[in-house]
């Protein structure tokens, strides 16, 4: 995934002639020198990276506004980042985000934000990159996370889920972008076109199709969220249940009214479940979101 995002950033920069990349302030896209710049606190990000507040409904930029007004507030953050690049003499290359904001805690994204942000990026001469390393391959009940938010990116990156854990990654883009990239930049990878990785990747696609795992993720995910919702009345710290398919985020708080994040409490439950043989994690900018991501073969009986 790291290398896929690095190639995608390079492709966007070569294709547009720009350098500036917009990301969110709580994402994670890899650990190489260049890609890790997208995952640092805003004050540590260099001049060619601008981080915006990630769009969400639970802790919005401003309380008491309508859905459309909230969307506009977050879109203004995109516009402000573009203006800041222009003021610094840095042309825009694009915006890179996970389309379901997985590491941000799977927040409920204000309506039409992704589609309209993509339009703003295009109008400014940039490209929209969807990091599908976590969201892709039917995890959400759709093949791709960007389908959940009803938009089409210019570049899509993929990682180890496409090989079911075997090291495998990929970058997909429109033909003209790929042709332009190959014409202006020499890219070589010793491990490209590996027969073993290719065979595993094809096997993963076959299993997803023949075992109807996309539909399974959608149906079982709906059931699991409905069962978790029944627990809310008995579980005060469980403030909100979010996500799509078999990718679920639970907002864990110490006070529902004040929405006080409880990272320590979330970590306690992560470890308790680990002791019982269930592996989940904590995510989000505040570290208080329980991230539940079972295998695509997870059934109602398991749930």
PLM regions: where:
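Conserved N-terminal phosphate-binding loop of PLP-dependent enzymes in the Aspartate aminotransferase
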Residues: 1-303
């Amino acid at each position: 995934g790291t290398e896929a995002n690095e190639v995608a950033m390079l492709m966007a920069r070569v294709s547009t002639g720009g350098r500036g990349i917009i990301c969110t302030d709580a994402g994670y896209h890899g650990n190489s020198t260049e890609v890790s710049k997208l995952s640092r606190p805003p004050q540590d990000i260099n001049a060619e990276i601008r981080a915006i507040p990630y769009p969400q409904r639970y802790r919005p930029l401003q309380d008491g506004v309508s859905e459309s007004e909230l969307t506009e507030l977050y879109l203004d953050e995109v516009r402000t980042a573009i203006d800041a690049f222009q003021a610094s003499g840095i042309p825009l290359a694009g915006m890179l985000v996970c389309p379901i904001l997985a590491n941000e805690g799977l927040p409920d994204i204000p309506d039409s934000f992704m589609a309209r942000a993509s339009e703003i990026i295009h109008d400014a001469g940039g490209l929209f990159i969807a990091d599908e390393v976590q969201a892709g391959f039917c995890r959400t009940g759709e093949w791709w996370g960007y389908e959940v938010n009803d938009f089409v990116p210019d570049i899509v990156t993929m990682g180890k889920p496409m090989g079911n854990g075997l090291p495998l990654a990929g970058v997909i883009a429109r033909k003209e972008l790929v042709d332009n990239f190959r014409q202006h930049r020499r890219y070589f990878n010793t491990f490209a076109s590996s027969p073993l990785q290719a065979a595993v990747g094809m096997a993963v696609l076959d299993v997803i199709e023949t075992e109807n795992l996309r539909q399974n993720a959608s149906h079982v995910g709906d059931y699991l969220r409905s069962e978790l919702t029944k627990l809310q009345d008995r579980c005060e710290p469980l403030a909100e249940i979010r996500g799509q398919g078999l990718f679920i985020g639970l907002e864990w708080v110490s006070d529902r009214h004040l929405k006080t994040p409880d990272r320590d409490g979330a970590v306690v439950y992560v470890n308790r479940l680990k002791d019982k043989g269930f592996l989940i994690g904590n995510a989000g900018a505040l570290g208080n979101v329980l991230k539940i991501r079972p295998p695509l073969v997870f059934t109602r009986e398991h749930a």
